[in-house]
């Protein structure tokens, strides 16, 4: 399968290991994927390399269906949550689509036997024992996601939502940390 990447410095055939100061993901993703028994596709490798590259704050991945965009983005989100006190927001066009990521996060947490201090299915918020939170949001109710500072925003199914204003007006200001990033898939 041929993957076309618009940025020449983003590889899609191998995960690039950067120095610890430069990379966004503070934990190595390769061994983590091995523990999950996941062999990433070229499109997933490109997403990993793009988000890890300090040059790019906003990563937009226009990738065909059934390529594991949501899955790899959730793995990236969980890796970020393993850094104490991190806040991750996963946005979807509606709450029924956000349930996919909520279930994925629960399964990843269960797989690695992480201690959960809060698992609120109604509000779709998970807090792990290191103080990190993973929150699901909907473009339809973006106001419920503001007022916090996020380390990572994952905008799932970005092509399905008219979320330009939701991101630019409501969510972009929540990426107020020096190294905070967003992925649009």
Question: What kind of feature is each model-predicted range?
Answer:
Residues 2-185:
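Phosphate/NTP-binding elements of NTP-utilizing enzymes
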